[in-house]
Amino acid sequence: MSQLSKVEDEILSQVKRFLKHINSNLPEGMELEFEGFYRRGFFVTKKRYALIEDDTIVAKGLELVRRDWAPIAKKTQRKVLMAILRDGSPEKAREIIREVVGRIRRGDVELDDLVIHTQITRDLSEYKQIGPHVIAAKRSLEKGRRVERGSIVRYIIVKGRGPISQRAFPVEDAEGMGYDPDYYIENQVMAAVSRIMSSLGYSTEDMNSLSSGERQSSLDAFF
């Protein structure tokens, strides 16, 4: 048995003794439960965190567990967290972001990785704030597709001028239109990883250079 395994066994043994002591003093019907043992954790805020157990990320409140983010953002965030929590390497996390940003700028991303899923929670006429999903839903209606309360709208943000919401098109109609790389870099990928990286010491300038593809100094010494 490795030294690390011995330490883990000792910690788990202490946890069990602690639970037994606490539960013996709790009122009937109440019980403190053990949920899991995690070697590393990363807390963005109290209710937004990621933990790792073996090679599995357990997350709460982060983009990778939310449906209304493009897969490219969720996948990148998951890879970044694995680099930090499993490998202990901010440098690797940085290179992951740089590689994804480069692929987006080159147009080397599958359409499915750009699709945003958002649920329609009310009648379209009841929306006061007309977000991208509402515009995409209305365009689907114009094409004769059924859209109602509870429907999931799948859309892409395409290139062009004007507000982002006006450039939201149903995925069925977006083929060949060309996605907006700046939107997917700034509003999806960087939005999903910037708070994580800034918690490791990356500045706004560092993040700007990442999103533009510039080189920057290593933070491997952090770990």
From Swiss-Prot:
Any one of the GO BP annotations: DNA-templated DNA replication
Enzyme class: transferase
Coiled coil: none
Keywords: DNA replication, DNA-binding, DNA-directed DNA polymerase, Exonuclease, Hydrolase, Nuclease, Nucleotidyltransferase, Transferase
The protein, known as: DNA polymerase PolB subunit 2
Further comment: In some Methanobacteriaceae the PolB protein is split over 2 genes.
An MF annotation (GO) of this entry: nucleotide binding
Temperature dependence: Optimum temperature for DNA polymerase is 60 degrees Celsius, functional between 60 and 80 degrees Celsius. Exonuclease activity is higher at 70 than 50 degrees Celsius.
PANTHER family the record matches: DNA POLYMERASE CATALYTIC SUBUNIT, DNA POLYMERASE DELTA CATALYTIC SUBUNIT
Pfam families: DNA_pol_B (PF00136)
SUPFAM superfamilies named among the record's database cross-references: DNA/RNA polymerases (SSF56672)
Source organism, top-level taxon: Archaea
Notes on how activity is controlled: DNA polymerase is inhibited by replication protein A (RPA), while 3'-5' exonuclease activity is not. Polymerase inhibition can be overcome by replication factor C (RFC) and PCNA.
Known function: In addition to polymerase activity, this DNA polymerase exhibits 3'-5' exonuclease activity.
The UniProt record lists the keyword Iron: no
Subunit and partners: Formed of a complex between PolB1 and PolB2; the exonuclease activity is associated with subunit 1. Probably binds replication protein A (RPA).
Catalytic activity: DNA(n) + a 2'-deoxyribonucleoside 5'-triphosphate = DNA(n+1) + diphosphate
Record EC number: 2.7.7.7
Cited InterPro entries: DNA-dir_DNA_pol_B_multi_dom, DNA/RNA_pol_sf, DNA_pol_B_thumb, DNA_pol_palm_dom_sf, DNA_pol_type-B
